Amino acid sequence: MTASHAALLEAARSGAQAAAAVILDIYATPFEVRRKADQSPVTLADEEAERRIIAALERVAPEIPIVAEEQVAASGLPATLASRYWLVDPLDGTRGFVDRSDEFSINIGLIEDGWPVLGVIGMPTQRLVYAAAGPGTATRQRDGGKPERIAARVAPAKPVVLSSRLHGPSRRIEAYLATVPGAVHRPMGSAAKFCLIAEGTADHYPRYGETSEWDTAAGQAIVEAAGGSVTTLDGARLGYGKAGYRNPPFLVRGRT
């Protein structure tokens, strides 16, 4: 029997909560930082969080393949893609975790036929979980309480434009800001940027640097469910199943 989106959403939410617990346990202690082949950092928190997420997803839907960042780093990309699969980044913003900036998240997205249909983002230090599984279903859950509905907004007179803190200011970001009258620029780390647009506290997020599909799938599902959009720079909806799971530059926006 194929699990429903509602059951899969609860599995992803459970996985995010289990991952958040172990991440916070490790965050509160001294921890070792190692380097992957691409020289990006990895910690025990990345690995333990990924194990817990995979266990939660496989309990409900063992037939759905899981493409998870640390598994890919250790074993390489899957040879073939199914039409339905999970994309998991167990600790998005590992550098923020290492720097103890609190800017990191847990990203769990479900892809069907090349599009994100379900997403959960956990923000451990804020004790927040954002989730969605279709139009009008985006929610924010605080500290295990009742999920509350959220929606993207039409940009106000002073739109908030988010950018990656890690990659810092760039000419392309400065050029984009020049096209948004009254823009208020706010750099920050992790997939939290998608959540702020989905909940209506930010309006634009242009991304020009490299990202992988597991960085964006959950956030895109949540933003789109909240009434926003995630597109390539030519205006096409960002799709999945690309070579190497790599994204082109993209733009996240609230309601237009």
How would you name each of these model-derived features?
Residues 47, 51, 70, 90-93, ...:
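Generic detector of well-ordered alpha-helical packing
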Residues 1-91, 175-178:
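N-terminal subdomain of lithium-sensitive/metallo-dependent phosphomonoesterases centered on the IMPase/IPPase/PAP
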